[in-house]
């Protein structure tokens, strides 16, 4: 018997030793939009937040410690223009993600390619965020059409340069 996803199933029967109930929970990929930021999405597979490691460069200051304010990452910021952006409508990106097959012999790991703003990001591995440690990572992704991305890039490059320069000369004492 199938439930509609918002209800439950009653099993009314007399149980015998060895009886089993098998429950299949289809877990499709879906995008969850960040509240107030329509162009940023989290990738979910069922209840699991998915992410990708994007490198281990410039990690100085990014490991938390138990000191005062130790939970705040203070390493070098990376401009948004140097991060992977998912290119396509949300529907197209969702369809792409649901067409992925897990990497051979690996659970919940998917190789991504042909979906980014720059081919240099092809080969990133999407996996449960809980498995990602000691690296820079993507958990919230900018997702927009190619035309939307071109307009966004033009609009934000100058502002980002200004903010990065301000961050470089700001001292947090």
What are these regions, as identified by a protein language model?
Residues 2-4, 13, 20-171:
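C-terminal beta-rich recognition modules with glycine/proline-rich loops and embedded aromatic residues
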Residues 7-8:
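Short S/T/G- and acidic-enriched coil/turn segments that sit immediately N-terminal to beta-strands
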């Amino acid at each position: 018997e199938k439930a509609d996803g918002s209800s439950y199933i009653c099993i009314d029967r007399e149980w015998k030793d060895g009886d089993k109930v098998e429950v299949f929970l289809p877990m499709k990929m879906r995008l969850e939009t960040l509240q107030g930021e329509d162009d940023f999405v989290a990738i979910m597979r069922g209840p699991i937040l998915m992410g990708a490691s994007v490198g281990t460069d410039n990690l100085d200051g990014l490991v938390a410690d138990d000191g005062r304010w130790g939970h705040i990452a203070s390493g070098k910021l990376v401009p948004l223009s140097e991060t992977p952006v998912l290119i396509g409508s949300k529907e197209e990106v969702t369809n792409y993600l649901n067409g992925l097959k897990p990497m051979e012999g690996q659970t919940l790991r998917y190789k991504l390619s042909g979906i980014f703003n720059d081919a240099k990001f092809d080969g990133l591995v999407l996996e449960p965020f809980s498995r990602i440690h000691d690296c820079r990572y993507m958990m919230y992704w900018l997702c927009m059409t190619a035309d939307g991305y071109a307009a966004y890039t033009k609009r934000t490059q100058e502002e980002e340069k200004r903010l990065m320069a301000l961050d470089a000369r700001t001292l947090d004492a």
